[in-house]
A protein has these predicted regions:
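Second-shell loop/turn segments in exported
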Residues: 135-138, 181-183, 227-229, 244-250
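Short, glycine-/small- and polar/acidic-enriched structural segments
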Residues: 28-175, 180-191, 208-210, 216
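N-terminal signal peptide c-region/cleavage motif recognized by signal peptidases
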Residues: 23-25
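Secondary-structure end/capping motifs
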Residues: 231-276
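Bacterial N-terminal signal peptides that target proteins for export
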Residues: 2-16
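Periplasmic-binding protein-like
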Residues: 109-119, 202-228, 236, 240, ...
Length: 276
């Protein structure tokens, strides 16, 4: 498991975080709530490390990291001012902003999108058009859902050609491995789901990346409310500066980042890693 998360962290940290930087200044601690897209996984390791090792505290931020229920939900909570910042799919954020949500991206993690259709290798599916009439699993509020209709259209398919079924996020991979209800594929990220499938005994899935079908987009972004940008730009800059520092540390020391997640979620990951 530790190797799994270390690989995800290394892939995630080879990314761009884009934001304006200013000179170092002393700040009073601000209470900040960060909303993640899902429960903790490898791509979140920089946030976890920054919390555990005091990076955010050093930048005057008292951070409260909350798990989420999908990218759309995470960004929506920022738009509703439940949370100060969100981490999730840029596609989901763009979709919400286009509908009037008062949010903007202030930073990018994973500059290249990782969204894909992941297919069981024993399904007989060789091309994306072979998915016609097949069942595909996903989770409600997942950012990967946003541009799936465009992928289908660019491949010469209609939404009605496939059977999309929502399952809980925690059951997505297990349902895929069991072929639940005849499912042959899931919608997910190349940055974590293939590794999770293999870690649970599954074979390497066949991948149809969205980018192969005309959907080239930024992967995951950090978003905040327009009012934060307008009224407290210094906080936004400090948050991104601290995040950049934390992810740089995670890239240099992925084991520490994995341990930081373990510290937060209760140590089960660290215990399993210790048996490796």
């Amino acid at each position: 498991m530790k190797n799994l998360f270390s690989n995800i962290i290394k892939n995630t940290c080879n990314c761009a975080i884009i934001i304006l930087l200013t000179s170092a200044t002393s700040f009073a601690a601000d209470k900040v709530k960060l909303r993640l897209n899902w429960m903790y996984y490898g791509s979140h390791a920089g946030f976890a490390l920054g919390f555990v090792d005091g990076t955010y505290e050093k930048h005057g931020i008292d951070i409260d990291i909350r798990s989420g229920n999908g990218s759309s939900s995470a960004h929506r909570l920022v738009a509703n001012k439940d949370s100060h910042f969100s981490y999730g799919s840029c596609g989901a954020m763009t979709d919400l902003a286009s509908k009037g949500a008062p949010i903007k991206s202030i930073g990018v993690i994973d500059a290249m999108g990782t969204e894909a259709i992941l297919v069981r290798p024993d399904s007989g599916v060789k091309t994306i058009k072979d998915l016609k009439g097949k069942k595909i699993l996903t989770t409600a509020n997942a950012g990967v859902n946003t541009f799936f209709p465009i992928v289908l259209a660019n491949a010469g398919l209609k939404e009605s050609d496939v059977n999309i079924t929502n399952v809980p996020d925690g059951a997505l991979v297990s349902s895929y491995l069991q072929g639940s209800g005849g499912a042959v594929a899931i919608l997910g990220g190349l940055d974590d789901k293939p590794a999770e499938i293999k870690a649970n005994g599954g074979a390497q899935p066949i991948a149809f990346p969205y980018s192969d079908f005309g959907v080239n987009q930024v992967g995951y972004c950090i978003a905040t409310h327009n009012d934060t940008i307008r009224n407290n730009p210094g906080l936004a800059k400090r948050f991104i500066r601290a995040t950049m520092e934390a992810y740089a540390k995670a890239e240099k020391n992925p084991d520490a980042a994995v341990d930081a997640i373990a510290d937060i979620v209760g140590g089960s990951m660290a215990e399993e890693a210790g048996r490796k």
